[in-house]
Curated annotation (Swiss-Prot):
Role: Specifically methylates the uridine in position 2552 of 23S rRNA at the 2'-O position of the ribose in the fully assembled 50S ribosomal subunit.
Binding sites annotated in the UniProt record for S-adenosyl-L-methionine: 60, 62, 80, 96, 121
The protein's name: Ribosomal RNA large subunit methyltransferase E
Catalytic EC class: transferase
Location of the protein in the cell: Cytoplasm
Length: 211
């Protein structure tokens, strides 16, 4: 089957991308690893010994970074509907974390250890139709925040990918009602044309309505 011009253009861009080349050289699973590395450098999110929950983890670019950063005395609990190859120091739970059975597996994996950080690089399969894609993207990031509300320890932190568009401003208001500090980041590894940004919530307070 012949490829479309757009798919050929994507392939050319992908394989010439400096972060794709760098990920191969550095042994990271995806270019997305560099987004979390930069976020961590700026916001000091991950430290040795932490417990991190990674939502939408496959193929493992963020879990790989988190596992390296928390070290042998920390843990990463990762979940995705898609399968993910094993990573050292990462416990992977396959399934939809909105299902009670999967959520309970995550809680079982967490155990009695307070969760220091919830991270999410989730995004829907993009159709190119904003009226379809944006609500789906906001739904996922709202699910990630719901999970954070349920498992984060007081003063814990949260990172998630969000797309500019309908629902974005309200989401930021909701975040500001849950954390002492909220910042927006656009890592260098994010493609400039992408509407994606990363919200960083620091110092979990529980949640209250912000007008």
């Amino acid at each position: 089957m012949a490829r479309s011009k757009s798919s050929n253009r994507w392939l050319e861009e992908h394989f010439s991308d400096q972060y794709v080349k760098k990920s191969h050289a550095d042994g990271y699973r995806t270019r997305a690893s560099y987004k979390l590395l930069e976020l961590n450098d700026k916001d000091r999110l991950i430290r040795p010994g932490m417990l991190v929950v990674d939502l939408g983890a496959a193929p493992g670019g963020w879990s790989q970074v988190a596992g390296q950063q928390v070290g042998t005395h920390g843990r990463v609990v990762a979940s995705d509907i898609l399968p993910m190859d094993t990573l050292e120091g990462v416990e992977f739970i396959q399934g939809d974390f909105t299902d009670d059975s999967v959520f309970n597996q995550i809680l079982l994996a967490i155990g009695d250890t307070p969760v220091d950080l919830v991270i999410s690089d989730m995004a829907p399969n993009m159709s190119g139709i904003n009226a379809v894609d944006q609500p789906q993207a906001m739904y996922l990031v709202e699910l990630a925040l719901d999970m954070a509300k349920r498992v984060l320890k007081p003063q814990g932190n949260f990172v998630a990918k969000v797309f500019h568009g309908e629902g974005y401003d309200q989401y930021l208001k909701d975040l500001k009602g849950c954390f002492e500090k909220v910042v927006i980041r656009k890592p260098d590894a994010s493609r400039s044309r992408s509407r994606e940004v990363y919200v960083v919530g620091k110092g979990f307070l529980g949640c209250q309505t912000v007008s």
